[in-house]
Amino acid sequence: MIMSTPAKNNNGTGLEDVNIPGQAYLREALTSCTDPLKAIESFQLENGVLLPSLRPMLPLLDLHGVRRLDFHTSLMEELRDKLIAHINEMGQKEPRERDKKLKELLVKSFPVVRVKSLRPVVMAILRNTQHIDDKYLKILVRDRELYADTDTEVKRQIWRDNQSLFGDEVSPLLSQYIREKEHILFDHTNLNNLFFHPTPKVRRQGEVVQKLANMIGTSVKLYDMVLQFLRTLFLRTRNVHYCTLRAELLMALHDLEVQEIISIDPCHKFTWCLDACIREKNVDIKRSRELQGFLDNIKRGQEQVLGDLSMTLCDPYAINFLATSAIKILHHLINNEGMPRDNQILILLLRMLALGLSAWVMIDSQDFKEPKLDCQVVTKFLPALMSLMVDDQCRSLHAKLPPDERESALTTIEHSGPAPDAVEAYIQESSVASILAMYYTLHTARLKDRVGVLRVLAILSACKDDRAYEDPFLHSLIALLIPMSEEFATEDFCTTLFDEFIFAGLTRENVTSRHMLKLLWYVHNKLPAGRLATLMKAMQPTTAHNEHIHKLYEILQERIGTGAAETPVIEAPPMEFDSPLKSVPTPGPHYNVQ
């Protein structure tokens, strides 16, 4: 068929198919005539403006130097815009009346789809057609130029049966999303717009989330494809930002009130409730009961839903909220002499933490069972952590007493020794315990309690699965340590932070090439010369590091050498276009696709 051949070789092809003389007709007329000028004049008379009201205008326009091409182009554009407006109005009518007329229009107009000036009319008809015949979709897919000009509403009908093409469209967006998250985490100039600062509502207004929501529209099949991409990529990379995107995408569709999708996603109400808690930074009794009800009422045969729920809870923003809320409750229990095991909201938070931290293992093993919360975390670890917290409170109170009262006060009892053995023992065995210890470290750093920070930092390298070296935590920790820059002049602070914590994680590239370079960028002038030299040697990038890291390291060296206080802006590393969706399996939804 003529329509299936590339448009660039047949510019204007299609007019003859709707009985309008086009290039082929004119070429034939000029090559077979005896008088070309007469042939052209005849062609103009036959195919020019036929309206009696407009034809008398032509001589006048000629006098004003207006070319016939400009006149006809202007006229065509005006008529085209009116026709498109009429088609869009038709698209709002009742389906029975609309579909029949649009189908007739499509049959008549589609042959001219390769005429660029007329293509918008054809695209408007397609955009308003709910169910497009496959023969048209195949032509659009086959021609790159036509596909590029096709509206998203039409592309959705193409993507539903072409997962690889949809993956090609989605892949750059997923890569962009990961780059944006990592830029916030690693940007050495960023001290204010920290990772956990934006609200959920602001985050899901981001470009990538909104584009994905628009691409999906109301299509359950496309939504499920995206979820399968996210599950597969999370499984392949362990990158928790895919979990964030899963939650943000669902809530973006919630904001848009896409009932076709949110009404059948079994995670919707749970994610909505959790999102409200994160937004308000609080879990009240009502919401805690709702969240617990979702977890308790998963029916037999629907256990696979736990996989998606665990991804929602593995989102760093969810982990941050759950852990921060748990630390707040522990402080409340200390002040009110309560027991951790008696606080049902605390138990629920720990239960959700355990589920979120097991997301990768659950999806990898396909064993959809909620992990059992170790009761000893509640009965032994939390009391030990609370004793550490009481020590810090007593020491803080003691420091506020007048100097003459300190020696006689009971608080002269030492509250600065090593962390309780139970704390160190349980963070080695439990991810939940590790997260709580890490977030208590952030709490003490926020208070600039140097002794409190050092007591916990000394044991954090023992956290299960190297949790303490994950990017969101290190990002937050470094941001809180930078304002404590005066402490870096003391040997005990450097010994604990660098020798006992940082150096234990040097094998992880993100620790050396990202977070430590940012820390040294701001505190290098407070460090003893010998310590700074040792750190710079340990941080020196290798051939395995990208050019951006090498450049940042070199500028840091210059900054140290000159004592510069200004912060030059380092260009972001070049965009990588490697698709993260290579070899992604065909989606297998756990609910009915419509």
Swiss-Prot record:
UniProtKB keywords: Chromosome, Nucleus, Repressor, Transcription, Transcription regulation
BP terms from Gene Ontology: negative regulation of transcription by RNA polymerase II; negative regulation of transcription elongation by RNA polymerase II; positive regulation of transcription by RNA polymerase II
GO MF annotation terms: RNA binding
Domain of life according to the entry: Eukaryota
Entries under InterPro entries matching the protein: COBRA1
Cell compartment(s), UniProt: Nucleus; Chromosome
Record flagged with keyword Transcription regulation: yes
Major localization listed first in the record, in broad terms: nucleus
Keyword Manganese: no
GO-annotated cellular components: chromosome; NELF complex; nucleus; transcription repressor complex
Residues annotated as transmembrane: none
Function (record text): Essential component of the NELF complex, a complex that negatively regulates the elongation of transcription by RNA polymerase II.
Similarity-based family: Belongs to the NELF-B family.
Subunit structure, interactors included: Component of the NELF complex. Interacts with Clamp.
Protein name: Negative elongation factor B
Annotated source species: Drosophila melanogaster (Fruit fly)
Gene expressing this chain: NELF-B
